[in-house]
Amino acid sequence: MMNRKQTVGVRVGSVRIGGGAPIVVQSMTNTDTADVAGTVRQVIDLARAGSELVRITVNNEEAAEAVPRIREELDRQGCNVPLVGDFHFNGHKLLDKYPACAEALGKFRINPGNVGRGSKRDPQFAQMIEFACRYDKPVRIGVNWGSLDQSVLARLLDENARLAEPRPLPEVMREAVITSALESAEKAQGLGLPKDRIVLSCKMSGVQELISVYEALSSRCDHALHLGLTEAGMGSKGIVASTAALSVLLQQGIGDTIRISLTPEPGADRSLEVIVAQEILQTMGLRSFTPMVISCPGCGRTTSDYFQKLAQQIQTHLRHKMPEWRRRYRGVEDMHVAVMGCVVNGPGESKNANIGISLPGTGEQPVAPVFEDGVKTVTLKGDRIAEEFQELVERYIETHYGSRAEA
C-alpha cells in the first residue's frame, strides 16, 4: 500500500478533504443552475451514484438566486451532499449581492486566472476571500492552464528570457501554473483565510503535463490537493487519460480529492464520471464503494455471450442496490463476485472470490458450479441460472454482512 502525502485537512460541510481522510469523489452538474428542479434532480443522481461533493455553476444573478432554493430542496429530499459554487469573472459581485447564496454553499471555487484583470485582479480576489472568511467557507483555488493568469506567465517569461540558458516554453508554462496557485494561496492566507480552508488544484489537459505539475506542486506545499484533467475528453479516451494521469499521482500518495471531467455523450447519464472515479480508487485499493465483479474477457472457448450478459447484469444490480446496502450491510463494498466463462480459469477465480460462478464454455457440460468462500455449494442448471445466481448473491450478502449492520 502506498503512503499518502500528509496534507492539511479541509472540512467541507460533513466531508473532510486531506489530513489523512479517504480520497473524496466529487462531480459537477451540467444543468442551468437557475433551473432549480433540473439541478436538484441531477445533484441527487450524482450523490446517489456516490459523489461526495457536487459542484454547480454560479455564473449569473439567476443562478446565484437559485442556489439557496436548490439547497433547501435537497435538504427536504434528504440529500445532504455539500454544494461547491463554481465562480468565474463575477463571483465577487454575486456573493456581495446574494449573501444567501454564499451561506448555502459548502465551498467556493475561485480561478485566479479570471477573478479580475489588471488592476482589478487583486481587489476582486480579495473580495472573494473576504466573503469566504465572513461566511466561514473553504475555497478551492483552481488554476487551469487554459485560463492561466497572464500576469504571472508574463513575469516568468521575462525572467526566463534573462537566463543564460532559457528553459523551454512548456516548462515555463507549467511553472506559471504552479506559481499562480501557490502565490494565490499565500495571498488568501495573508487576507485571513486559514490554511485549513484552502484546497489547491493545477489542472492541465495533457497526462504528462498534469503528472509533472502535481509532482512539483506536492513537493512545494502541504495544501490539500484536488486532482483531475481539466478536459479529459469523451468516452474511452477520457476514461483512459484520466485513469493514466491520476493513477500515477495516487500511487505516489498525491491527491486528496478527485473529479473525472468526462465529456458526456448527448443524453448520457452524468453519473458515469462518478463511477469512473470510484473504480479508479477501488481498483487501486485506496477505497471500496461497491462489490467488485471479476469476469473474464471471453475467447474461443466462450462463443456464447451468456456470461458477459450475466456479469453486466450482476454489476448493474449491485451498483443499483448499493445506496440501500451501504446502510444495511457494513463491509459489503469489499465483497468480490466472480462471473467466469469456462473451466480454464472459472473454478479458480470463483474460489478466490467471496462468491463466484463458473459458467460452461463451448463443448462443456451445461452446468455452472457456484463457490462461496472457496467451497463449492451448488451446481446450477437450466434456463434460470442467471436469476438463481443473483438470488444466491443476495442471500450471501444477507447472511455474511447482515450481522455487521449498524443498529
Swiss-Prot record:
GO terms assigned for molecular function: 4 iron, 4 sulfur cluster binding; 4-hydroxy-3-methylbut-2-en-1-yl diphosphate synthase activity (ferredoxin); 4-hydroxy-3-methylbut-2-enyl-diphosphate synthase activity (flavodoxin); iron ion binding
Ubl conjugation is among the record's keywords: no
Keyword Phosphoprotein appears in the UniProt entry: no
The organism's place on the tree of life at top rank: Bacteria
Catalytic activity, as annotated: (2E)-4-hydroxy-3-methylbut-2-enyl diphosphate + oxidized [flavodoxin] + H2O + 2 H(+) = 2-C-methyl-D-erythritol 2,4-cyclic diphosphate + reduced [flavodoxin]
One Pfam family linked to the record: GcpE
Keyword terms, alphabetized: 4Fe-4S, Iron, Iron-sulfur, Isoprene biosynthesis, Metal-binding, Oxidoreductase
Sequence positions that bind [4Fe-4S] cluster: C296, C299, C342, E349
EC class: oxidoreductase
NCBIfam families (alphabetical): ispG_gcpE (TIGR00612), PRK00366.1 (NF001540)
Family membership: Belongs to the IspG family.
Known role: Converts 2C-methyl-D-erythritol 2,4-cyclodiphosphate (ME-2,4cPP) into 1-hydroxy-2-methyl-2-(E)-butenyl 4-diphosphate.
Name recorded for this polypeptide: 4-hydroxy-3-methylbut-2-en-1-yl diphosphate synthase (flavodoxin)
Organism (species): Methylococcus capsulatus (strain ATCC 33009 / NCIMB 11132 / Bath)
